[in-house]
UniProtKB/Swiss-Prot annotation:
GO molecular function: DNA binding
Species whose genome carries this gene: Pseudomonas aeruginosa (strain ATCC 15692 / DSM 22644 / CIP 104116 / JCM 14847 / LMG 12228 / 1C / PRS 101 / PAO1)
InterPro entries assigned to the protein according to its UniProt record, in alphabetical order: Tscrpt_reg_PrtN
UniProt keyword list: Activator, Antibiotic biosynthesis, Bacteriocin biosynthesis, DNA-binding, Transcription, Transcription regulation
Protein name from the UniProt record: Transcription regulatory protein PrtN
UniProt cross-references to Pfam families, sorted A to Z: PyocinActivator
Biological processes per GO annotation: bacteriocin biosynthetic process; positive regulation of secondary metabolite biosynthetic process; regulation of DNA-templated transcription
Transcription regulation keyword on record: yes
C-alpha cells in the first residue's frame, strides 16, 4: 500500500524534477547548497529564519535525530517549490493591467 499524499501537497512537474536533479545530482539536496544556488541574497542566519517562519516554505529533513545532523531538502519538495513560485509569478503577471498588450 502506498502512503497517501495530502491534498495540499503540490505535485511538481516531471520536467522540473529532472532539471533540479541535473543541477544537484541527488534526491536529498544539502540545505546550504540550496541557499548558495537559489537564495544567495540571504545569509545563513536570514535563510534559517525564513525557513523557520514559513516565508520560504521548504520542509527540511535530516537523516539523524542529532541537532548537529546535516540538513537537506528533498528533491521533489524543492521542485514543487520552484513550480509554485513560477506559477505565482505568472499569475501576478497576468493580473497586471495591460499585461496582454505588452509585446514579447
Amino acid at each position: 500500500m502506498q502512503p497517501s499524499i495530502a491534498p495540499s501537497t503540490p505535485i511538481p512537474r516531471q520536467e522540473t524534477v529532472e532539471l533540479v536533479y541535473r543541477i544537484f545530482g541527488d534526491v536529498l539536496v544539502p540545505l546550504e547548497q540550496v541557499r548558495e544556488r537559489w537564495f544567495r541574497n540571504l545569509n545563513k542566519e536570514n535563510f534559517s529564519k525564513a525557513l523557520a517562519c514559513g516565508r520560504i516554505a521548504l520542509p527540511v529533513t535530516t537523516l539523524d535525530d542529532s541537532h548537529k545532523a546535516m540538513q537537506f531538502v528533498a528533491l521533489d519538495h524543492l521542485a514543487a517549490y520552484v513550480d509554485q513560485r513560477a506559477n505565482q509569478a505568472g499569475s501576478a503577471r497576468r493580473a497586471q493591467p495591460g499585461a496582454d498588450s505588452i509585446a514579447s
